[in-house]
Regions:
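Extended, low-charge, aliphatic-rich alpha-helical segments
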Residues: 3-4, 15-101, 156-482
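Eukaryotic helix-linker segments that join adjacent hydrophobic helices
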Residues: 60-70, 74-107, 112-114, 119-152
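Classical eukaryotic N-terminal signal peptides for Sec-dependent ER targeting/secretion
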Residues: 1-10
Length: 482
């Protein structure tokens, strides 16, 4: 868990450009990682690979050598881990308690008159593993990196038992030196694991992180960090510039200021997300002509099939009844309604909520529209709706409300659009928008964090002037780490 925390905290950084994402990890968040921290240590310490120990036997009437092999950890109890903030730009952690048991084999050859070979076992027990580490978060190549500012390590007590051997007097010649070297090796390997290996892994991961990440169908998430985060006595906070765009396009929309208020309730973390990010996504998607959909006879399981028919009975309601020219020239056909954005859609986040505005062109074609290029008519539709965001199943999701549609005629080759038909078409458009929005919001945006640590489903989402703030605790999804 300390590994997860170091990666998570390292991703907190600051950009000199006005930020679009801000992350704050509070004392409560540090306590979460502290409480769970022993799990990753148990996993890492068990993987320690002890080197072979060799040394000469210099006492007694002869000479010889001793080799210690197959040293391995047979039992490990993690020390207690406590993380702390280290102003102005870092984080520290310390450990106390815990124990480790190590077993291995020794082989000795002692030459008096003739070589004498003997062997046995070694058992060691180390108690109270104490580590103090402070790391500073820096920036390298637009990516965060960890640097060790201060570090100390000690094992308070190490007891070694040397057993076996057919000639005790030979064993007594090297027992003190063997015990000393095993003690040093245990201290050394624990120190490397608890201090160096974890940080090297964190920096390796951080250095390998791409800053241009494809998230779906040529849509890319970009981010960059340029300055260190801010660490105080109660939280560590960093900012980054981020956007989501199509292909290799750029986004030059204005970025609005995000305040630093978090309210009075205590959470483990707070996340600020600027409306710049979804609006950049909409801008690039509109520029690439990707924001379009077709309502045809098969849309939403054929719900609008009868209305889109050019021919219908006297008691039925269809588009052919409103426009006889369709029934005359295209009998028993269907009309496709192709919707596409006429201007860049806009998402507005206010304290009162989130609203979306779309200006759509609606072109009418004989179905299928891909085979009939003549536009029968064009309408303009102004669509607005509100979004109520939520976190469901570890994804940022939501529902839409207050959908309004206003349609006006732009041009037509099939006759004038009267208000009765416009009203029917507005209802159809509203239903289509709801179907598409509900489908997209149901999928949502998955919110993974670091190594099975994610946000709680009861996270609070607050809309402010130009941004959303997510106030959340962390939860850990248990997996087997053996």
């Amino acid at each position: 868990m300390c590994f997860r925390l170091l990666v998570f905290v390292s991703l907190i950084c600051i950009t000199s450009q006005q930020s679009t994402i801000r992350v704050r990890l509070t004392d409560n968040g540090l306590h979460f990682f502290s409480d769970e921290g022993h799990h990753i240590l148990e996993h890492e310490v068990k993987k320690i690979d002890f080197p072979q120990i060799s040394f000469p036997i210099t006492g007694g009437p002869g000479t010889g050598t001793v080799n210690v092999t197959n040293l391995k950890i047979s039992q490990f109890t993690s020390p207690n881990i406590q993380f702390k903030l280290a102003p102005p730009n870092g984080i520290g952690w310390k450990t106390e308690g815990g124990s480790v048991k190590v077993v291995g084999d020794w082989q000795a050859v002692y030459k008096l008159v003739v070589p004498i070979s003997t062997s046995g076992y070694v058992k060691a027990s180390a108690v109270d593993i104490r580590t103090v580490l402070q790391a500073d978060i820096d920036v390298d190549g637009k990516r965060p990196q960890l640097n060790i500012d201060a570090c100390s390590m000690d094992v308070q007590s190490v007891d070694v038992i040397v057993g076996g051997g057919v000639l005790p007097w030979i064993v007594n010649l090297f027992r003190p030196e063997l015990s000393r070297l095993v003690r040093e090796e245990i201290r050394s390997q624990l120190c490397i694991t608890l201090q160096t290996v974890l940080l090297e892994k964190v920096n390796e991961i951080l250095h390998s992180l791409p800053t241009h990440i494809q998230i779906a169908n040529n849509f890319f998430l970009n981010y960059r960090c340029e300055e260190k985060p801010l660490s105080t006595n109660s939280f560590i906070e960093g900012e980054m510039y981020s956007d989501i765009v199509y292909d290799n396009t750029t986004c030059d929309l204005p970025i609005r200021y995000m305040d630093h208020e978090v309210g009075h309730e205590e959470y483990m973390a707070h996340f600020w997300i600027s409306d710049y990010i979804p609006n950049c996504l909409l801008l690039s998607a509109h520029s690439a002509n990707l924001l379009n959909f077709v309502v045809d006879k098969n849309f939403n399981k054929g719900k609008f099939k009868s209305f889109l028919s050019t021919s219908c009975s006297f008691i039925s309601l269809c588009i052919g009844r409103f426009f006889p020219i369709l029934h005359e020239y295209y009998p028993n056909e269907f009309v496709d309604l192709r919707f596409h954005t006429a201007d860049t859609p806009n998402i507005t986040i206010l304290p009162s909520g989130i609203s979306t505005n779309l200006l759509l062109d609606v072109d009418l074609f004989i179905s299928p529209w891909t085979e009939h290029k003549d536009v029968l008519a064009r309408l303009a539709a102004n669509v607005t709706f509100d979004i109520l965001p939520s976190i469901v199943n570890k994804s940022l999701s939501g529902t839409i409300t207050n959908v309004t549609v206003v349609i006006v005629e732009v041009k037509s080759t099939i006759g004038h659009f009267n208000q009765r038909f416009i009203a029917v078409l507005e209802t159809l458009t509203r239903d289509a928008i709801e179907v598409l929005a509900i489908s997209a919001l149901r999928i949502g945006i998955h919110l993974p964090l670091v190594d099975n640590v994610t946000l709680a489903d009861d996270a609070r989402i607050v809309s402010r002037q130009g941004f959303l703030r997510i106030d959340s605790d962390f939860v850990y999804q248990w997996n087997d780490v053996s």
